[in-house]
Amino acid sequence: MLFVHAHPDDESITTGGTIARYSAEGAHVTVVTCTLGEEGEIIPAELEQLGAWAGDQLGGYRIGELAEAGVALGWSEHRFLGGPGRWRDSGMAGVESNEHPRAFVRGAMSEQVEQLLAVFDEVRPEVVVTYDPNGGYGHPDHIRAHRVATAAVERSEGVRRLFYTVSSREATTRGLAALRRDERVPFRVPADEELPTTPDADITTRVDISAYREVKFAALRAHRTQITVGPDCFALSNGIAQPVPTTEFFVLARGPKEGADTDLFGGL
């Protein structure tokens, strides 16, 4: 199986438990990251000079964080799309970094799809996981990762299922309610509608990660420039609490539905 993500930390936030579970169960798990996350904000004050606005060394630092997360999750192998540094974090929509010559969103789709197809040819995944058409929350790099992954899947005869990673509206609502009752939570707990979610009626697949939740937390901690972990939750640099359910959620976008309710490989 193969996961296509935009930046270091996305793999742990959205699919960390699933990566850990299938890795532990013996699947060959490949994670492809499209950029180094150079435009990310930085939580530790002592590392702020790594930022794109200063030393511009954050991307290299995040390679190390990603490697540490990979050790925790146990994936088989990792690739950067086109090699480390080929594509740069574009930043959020409408910012100056969108125009960087190596910005992921400025790159030729044809080149990016060919680069991903080259990985497909090597590892021959049966299952591919990426974001939904909105990239989960609208980040330009997430949207481009979706487009590249879906285009590559359409041209690959070996991929039998394509899934989008999503957040369950019901699970998020329950998780936030629990965080509001927990006085240990050091972050601002948002209103339900503040976090992007998917209606549960649209969710096709629910993967139980309860046995791997602590592994997911270990991977989240590895991304220390981007993430602070709290009790049953984490926060990005905005300090907004996000719950970590015991299930990860997916929408089957392509391939047979039979057997896919709780297992990305079910019925294959």
From Swiss-Prot:
Query: What remark does the entry make about the cofactor?
Result: Binds 1 zinc ion per subunit.
The UniProt entry's GO biological process terms, in alphabetical order, are: mycothiol biosynthetic process
Catalytic activity of the protein: 1D-myo-inositol 2-acetamido-2-deoxy-alpha-D-glucopyranoside + H2O = 1D-myo-inositol 2-amino-2-deoxy-alpha-D-glucopyranoside + acetate
Keywords of this entry: Hydrolase, Metal-binding, Zinc
Q: What is its EC number?
A: 3.5.1.103
Task: Give the protein's cofactors.
Answer: Zn(2+)
Top-rank taxon, per record:
Bacteria
Q: Which residues of this UniProt protein bind Zn(2+)?
A: H7, D10, H142
List the Gene Ontology MF annotations in alphabetical order: N-acetylglucosaminylinositol deacetylase activity; zinc ion binding
- Family from the record: Belongs to the MshB deacetylase family.
Biological role = Catalyzes the deacetylation of 1D-myo-inositol 2-acetamido-2-deoxy-alpha-D-glucopyranoside (GlcNAc-Ins) in the mycothiol biosynthesis pathway.
UniProt name for this protein:
1D-myo-inositol 2-acetamido-2-deoxy-alpha-D-glucopyranoside deacetylase
From what organism does this protein derive? Saccharomonospora viridis (strain ATCC 15386 / DSM 43017 / JCM 3036 / CCUG 5913 / NBRC 12207 / NCIMB 9602 / P101) (Thermoactinomyces viridis)
Q: What is the lineage of its organism?
A: Bacteria, Bacillati, Actinomycetota, Actinomycetes, Pseudonocardiales
Gene expressing this chain: mshB
